[in-house]
A protein has these predicted regions:
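Histidine/acidic residue-rich metal-binding segments in metalloenzymes
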Residues: 6-20, 36-146, 162-184
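Short beta-strand/loop segments at the ligand-binding rim of alpha/beta enzyme cores
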Residues: 20-28
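Short, ordered loop/turn segments at secondary-structure junctions
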Residues: 29-31, 58, 90, 151-152, ...
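His/Asp/Glu-enriched, well-ordered alpha-helical/loop segment
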Residues: 84, 105-116, 168-234
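Short, catalytically relevant binding-site loops at active-site mouths
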Residues: 92, 123-125, 152-155, 189-191
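Active-site clefts of carbohydrate-active enzymes
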Residues: 145, 150-158
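N-terminal beta-loop-helix "entrance" segment that forms/cooperates
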Residues: 158-160, 229
Length: 234
């Protein structure tokens, strides 16, 4: 509801100008959620103008305790339009977050296997090894893919919570050997949250490899190339 449809209209104009040079895919982001009526109105309008449905269930969980309902709305919309769904989950490096697991359950419930992509998954590393590997099995059942955005939360604040020692990154070193497709993204570019993030995919990729201690060059090439196409459905 902040920018209404102005940004996506401009984006479509840009896509038309550069259509011979690059393939552009658009997704929305529900920074104000999908529960509040005005936010829902603009979500419904915007969902007709994008190539994949994007969402942030934490917004509605924080404001209304209705994060699971928000997932239902996102997945229902994506399914009805026959497009993929990209959902930001487990962003805050906390063992209290289980959004990736919840999204797996909702993906299967809505029959959206292979059409849902989780973004971040940072808090997965804060859980026990037993939980993590049970989650990877559930991700395989849901055919869920993951987009890592390493710069987004590498500056995680110091905490007094007890959790397994790890860096605040998507655990790509565990996911990839478990058969989960991992791609790379950025969230966000030189904004007030991450002012030093330049949107450079090499910066993101090198941080992921170093931070996960995962110098598998073949896997990194896949993350930067074919896996990116998979999560975009191209």
């Amino acid at each position: 509801p902040v920018c209404e449809d102005r940004a996506i209209i401009a984006a479509h104009k840009a896509r038309e100008v550069y259509k011979h040079d690059i393939v552009l895919k658009f997704a929305n982001q529900t920074l104000k959620g999908v529960i509040e009526p005005t936010a829902r109105k603009w979500f419904d309008i915007g969902s007709e103008m994008v190539d994949m449905i994007g969402g942030l269930p934490y917004r509605d969980e924080l404001d209304y305790g209705r994060g699971l309902e928000a997932m239902d709305i996102l997945l229902d919309t994506a399914k009805s339009r026959g497009i993929m769904c990209h959902v930001h989950v487990d962003q805050f490096n906390s063992p209290t977050e289980i959004e990736t697991e919840q999204l797996c359950d909702k993906t299967i419930e809505h029959g959206m296997q292979g059409r849902v992509v989780a973004i971040h998954g940072i808090s997965i590393g804060s859980h026990s090894k037993d939980y993590r590997y049970r989650l990877y099995e559930k991700m395989r059942q849901a055919q869920m893919m993951m987009i890592a955005c390493p710069m987004a939360w590498i500056d995680s604040n110091r905490k007094e919570e007890l959790m397994p020692f790890h860096n605040a990154l998507t655990p790509a070193d565990e996911m990839i050997p478990e058969g989960i497709t991992v791609a790379i993204g950025t969230d966000n570019i030189c904004d007030y949250m991450v002012p030093l993030c330049e949107g450079d995919m090499w910066q993101e990729l090198s941080l992921l490899a170093a931070g996960c201690r995962f110098p598998d060059l073949d896997a990194m090439v896949n993350i930067a190339s074919i896996n990116g196409r998979k999560v975009l459905g191209i």
